[in-house]
Amino acid sequence: INDNNSSEKKEQQGKRNLEKAAMIAAAADVPVTMVSRYDLNIASGIIHTIKEYEATDIVIGLHRKANIVDSFFGHLAESLLKGTHREVMIAKFLMPVNTLRRINIAVPPKAEYESGFSKWVEHFCRMGSILGCRVHFFANERTLMRVQQLVKKRHAGTPTEFSILEEWEDLLLLTGQVNYDHLLVVISARRGSISYDPSFERLPAQLGKYFSNNSLIILYPDQFGEPVSYTHLRAHETRHDLV
């Protein structure tokens, strides 16, 4: 709750939102601890709560009618992503999660070098297995190979597909691949990270324009821990090619 303009009405609304989230989590048999916090602004409140509770994953939900650009991107996103290195997901669902038929994941070049790479792959493979829906990865050839290796090693039971996305600018070509009952996941990156690309700055506007009628998740990988090195991956790829 923003301490600068808090009121009894806003406090009650915040409590109702927490209770609604707790009910949804309870239906999925997920334990929830409800926390109300007063702070100077939303980003500061989230960042301090992450530290106090040692949160490892941050999920921010947007209202189904909200514009993803106006609701999150801007000062809030910049402050939050600078304030924590933990994995951040911005989610907007237009339909119940258990009715999704497919998860489409757009992966940028060099995403395999981020320290949170295996973590988010596991998230969505597990999600696909639980929901009984196919997980379809789109990436350039090198990155797609690393995704395939990881899925084969750790999540072989998950129904998956893999398609080449030669250029990140071709993201708009996915409009023909994503239906209303699909979830589109876009793996982004923090400014200055190894997989960051300046084209990410246009991403919110593109998603708002071309995928406004789709359920969306934008994920910023975990930067916590040791990043995967080029040397390590190149050595792995060399061994793989020789087998």
Task: Identify the meaning behind each predicted range.
Residues I1-R146, K153-H155, E161-T175:
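Structured cytosolic domains appended to multi-pass membrane proteins
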Residues A55-T56, Y180-L183:
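Local beta-strand N-terminus motif with an aromatic residue
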Residues R146, E166-N179, S195-G208:
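A short, acidic, amphipathic alpha-helical segment used as a generic capping/interface helix at domain edges
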Residues L62-S79, I187-Q206, P221-S229:
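Glycine-rich, Arg-bearing micro-motifs that act as flexible, cationic patches
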Residues T231-H240:
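Conserved small/polar residues in nucleotide/adenosyl-binding loops
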Residues G128-L131, G208-S212:
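Short, conserved loop/helix-junction motifs that constitute active-site signature segments
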Residues L183, Y210-I217:
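C-terminal functional regions that serve as terminal interaction/effector modules
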